[in-house]
Regions:
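N-terminal beta1-alpha1 cap of cysteine-dependent amidohydrolase-like domains
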Residues: 1-348, 356-385
Length: 385
């Protein structure tokens, strides 16, 4: 019942725009039943009949199954749906979701769409995409990166980091294994044993006090053990807090978000956020220019100015910057005005880099985030000793 308005809208779209301008592609389940592994078409026959009864005639049927559709099964679906055999597309399980476009390309799905809608024929160049798929499915050395979060049981909570590490591994010809670690567990146990053996650490963005001390523990562990570290947003801020506590000796250093009455708020609220009570859509959001000075981040980006996406309400307290930099933590990235700190790097460490912005948001399969790429590259070197 809930889907009926959408079905009617689809039917009306075909009527109002003209059938030459609308194409219906129906994805249906083709289950495998019994010990002999026989594919069954009954669910597809039923759903096609239902659609036809609603005034929608599928032009293409995509049969989702564990394996490639048997030829007789595909022909049977075409017969009952009254469509050409080539319009029945097999969608078997793939090694990776990124292989799916290649599977459809082999079955000439683009040609079906071009022919049905009268579009100009194009021949896509998928050489780079094939190479990418080959790399992520046939990677070489394996590195293990720990992601320290507090929602790690929810698969998609840190999906941008997960995918970016996959892309970085593809570029470097390695596989990246992720070790998910709950920050509150580190905090409660008071131990960093869960980190032992990893080749790199990511502390991603977040908010709130729960798990913050666990993330600080992870930042300290990576710093003192010379393990590659990437902090993002909250991970950038907490890396600063950890450094101030354990290197500068400011034992009560903290963020004013976590300790509003604290004496040493090395992380403080943005000036424009002071007094804001309605928190909805008031953060510093979106693309902002970042100016990079000499350092790892600039080398990885290959340029002195970049635009990256932001989502934060707090920043490094400018009153502490000189002390922090004199102690060896350099802010090699700043905003366009030079006042806000955007990137930090630790001197004498193989890779201890953090950013106030979210580099994972702009990462793409053929162009992974430079900071994640640097982390994986450093992790490979760390693993090989």
């Amino acid at each position: 019942i809930e889907s009926m308005p959408f079905m009617e809208a689809a039917r009306l779209l075909g009527r109002e725009e003209g059938r030459d301008n609308v194409m219906f592609i129906h994805t249906t389940l083709v289950p495998i039943v019994g010990s002999v592994g026989e594919q069954k078409t009954k669910p597809t026959q039923h759903s096609v009949k239902e659609l036809q009864g609603l005034g929608i005639r599928p032009d293409v049927i995509v049969g989702r199954s564990d394996k490639k559709l048997d030829e007789d099964i595909a022909s049977k679906i075409a017969f009952f749906a009254d469509i050409p055999r080539e319009a029945v597309i097999s969608a078997p399980d793939a090694r990776t979701i990124y292989e799916v476009p290649l599977i459809f390309l082999e079955q000439k799905v683009p040609e079906l769409i071009e022919k049905r809608l009268g579009l100009k024929a194009k021949k896509p160049n998928v050489k780079k995409w094939r190479n990418f798929v080959d790399r992520i499915t046939n990677g070489g050395d394996e590195v293990e990166i720990a992601i320290i979060g507090k929602y790690t049981s929810l698969k998609d909570s840190y999906i941008s980091h997960e995918e970016t590490l996959l892309y970085a591994g593809a570029v470097l010809g390695c596989k990246v294994k992720i070790r998910w670690i709950e920050a509150p567990d580190l905090e409660d146990s008071g131990s960093t044993d869960a980190l032992e053996g990893v080749d790199g650490v990511i502390v991603p963005g977040g908010f709130g006090s729960r798990g913050s001390e666990g993330k600080i523990m992870a930042a300290k562990w990576a710093r003192t053990n010379q393990v590659p570290y990437l902090g993002v947003c909250f991970g950038f801020q907490l890396a600063t807090v950890e450094f101030c506590r354990n290197v500068l000796g400011l034992k009560d250093a903290n963020s004013s978000e976590l300790a509003p009455e604290g004496k040493n708020s090395v992380i403080d609220i943005l000036p424009e956020q002071e007094g804001v009570k309605d928190m909805g859509a008031t953060m510093r959001l979106g693309d902002h220019k970042v100016k990079l000075s000499k350092g790892k981040a600039r080398d990885l980006y290959g340029k002195a100015e970049v635009y990256e996406r932001h989502r934060h309400r707090y920043e490094i307290n400018p009153d502490y910057i000189d002390k922090i930099e004199k102690a060896g933590m350099k802010y090699t990235g700043r905003d366009n005005g030079g006042r806000r700190m955007e990137v930090l790097e630790l001197e004498g460490h193989p890779y201890y880099v953090a950013s106030q912005f979210h580099p994972e948001f702009k990462s793409r399969p053929d162009k992974p985030s430079p900071l994640h790429l640097g982390l994986v590259k450093a992790a490979l070197a760390n693993k090989k000793g």
